[in-house]
Regions:
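Conserved beta-strand edge residues that scaffold enzyme active sites
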Residues: 34-35, 68, 108-109, 211, ...
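Active-site-proximal, glycine-rich beta->alpha crossover segments in alpha/beta enzymes
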Residues: 93-97, 101-186
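Glycine-rich, histidine-containing beta strand-loop boundary motifs that form or position
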Residues: 63-65, 103-107, 208
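An N-terminal, globular interaction/scaffold subdomain
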Residues: 43-59, 64-66, 83
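Catalytic domains of carbohydrate-active enzymes, especially glycoside hydrolases
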Residues: 9-34, 53-57, 96-102
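Histidine-acidic metal/acid-base catalytic patches
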Residues: 1-4, 9-11, 52-55, 72-76, ...
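Glycine-rich, proline-tolerant flexible connector loops at the mouths of alpha/beta enzymes
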Residues: 32-48, 216
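A short glycine/small-residue-enriched secondary-structure motif
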Residues: 22, 59-74
């Protein structure tokens, strides 16, 4: 496996490439252009310039997270073909720049949601949290404010400002879209892009819904093992894969994350893994935690063991970290706790690997 670290370019991150380079075991970054709106082509020269910057820092740039899918594609509107064509052009440009993996989201309207971006933990650190009753009682205006007020004036992934004006209208639109219709629109997209994913040697890893249950009346795509099987069955290309996000899937107490890792890695359909832990407060309330198994409710050792034993050879990254040591950063994406998480994951991987000698 290759360990990567999520990073935003163009001054939109408090973490520097030179700092990432000093984290043991990290070989590269997972990055994106948050300033290019969904549906527009990513220029090849822009991609190459960023890759050059990353390479000069001694790191690789082989993972993109994310190339956002335009909402018209998800809605199945007549304009979708133009946006799909642009997406395919971006894929070609990424391939020619040496990109190997694209992580992307198919949740409608928003990629993820937390009711609190700074939830105080008993050790004095802060983590993101989800409280279902609070979330369900929020207006659209308060939904946006709850996410933006604690963003430290940085772009939150999946909450790019361009989305805000249409959010209320989009949520209303999806009230009349069944899960079956939504999956039909997704299949149309997959059938269009997967032949090019194979031609361009690009692995696609769809990110699970976060949280993995119905939210604001929106259709759900991936929240449990059955929906993952359904999604992968929409297009049987080996490039049509899953980003196994342990924290997203693990928020549902009924999900057996090690079993998921075993099943879908054995199929060769997991090109990318996000490893993080969560602590369940109730069946639908949770907060994020430090990566260690003892700090949350997921057995990180068993997850890593399942990955290793079932042939995982893709990319992995420490996911959301707590805010510790008075760091000022994008919520969930500071340097310190994610660096600790990276070292912990590397240690687990080494222990599992050596136990199989």
């Amino acid at each position: 496996m290759k360990m990567v670290f999520r990073w935003w370019p163009n001054g939109d991150d408090t973490v520097q490439l030179e700092q990432i380079r000093q984290i043991p075991g990290v070989s590269g970054v997972a990055t994106m252009f948050s300033d290019i709106p969904a549906g527009e082509v990513w220029p090849k020269e822009t991609i190459l310039a960023l890759k050059d910057q990353v390479n000069k820092a001694g790191l690789e740039m082989e993972v993109i997270e994310s190339v956002n899918v335009h909402e018209d594609i998800k809605k199945g509107l007549s304009t979708r073909d133009e946006y799909i064509s642009n997406y395919i052009t971006t894929m070609k440009n990424l391939h020619e720049a040496g990109i190997k993996c694209i992580c992307y989201n198919l949740m409608p309207v928003m990629d993820w949601f937390r009711s609190r971006l700074e939830y105080p933990l008993s050790d004095g650190s802060f983590a993101m949290a989800y409280e279902h009753s609070v979330a369900q009682g929020l207006s659209m205006e308060k939904i946006i404010h709850s996410m933006m007020d604690g963003s430290q004036d940085m772009t939150l992934p999946g909450w790019e400002p361009e989305r805000f004006p249409a959010m209320a209208k989009d949520i209303e639109f999806y009230k009349n879209v069944s899960a079956e219709e939504y999956f039909k629109n997704i299949r149309y997209f997959l059938d269009a892009v997967m032949p090019y994913a194979e031609e361009y040697d690009l692995d696609f890893g769809v990110h699970p819904d976060d949280p993995p249950w119905p939210l604001f009346g929106l259709p759900k795509v991936i929240g449990n093992v059955e929906s993952i099987r359904t999604f992968l069955g929409l297009n049987d290309s080996p490039r049509n894969g899953l980003t196994l996000c342990t924290g997203s899937l693990g928020a549902n107490t009924e999900n057996d994350v090690p079993a998921m890792a075993k099943e879908f890695c054995a199929m060769g359909r997991v090109p990318f893994v996000h490893l993080r832990n969560v602590r369940h407060v109730t069946k639908t309330d949770f907060h994020e935690s430090a990566h260690l198994s003892t700090e949350g409710d997921l057995d990180m050792y068993e997850i890593v063991k399942a990955l290793y034993e079932n042939g995982f050879d893709g990319y992995i990254r420490p996911d959301h970290g707590r805010r510790i040591w008075d760091e000022v950063s994008r919520p969930g994406y500071g340097l310190y706790d994610r660096a600790l998480g990276a070292c912990y994951i590397s240690g687990l991987w080494e222990a599992v690997a050596k136990s199989h000698r």
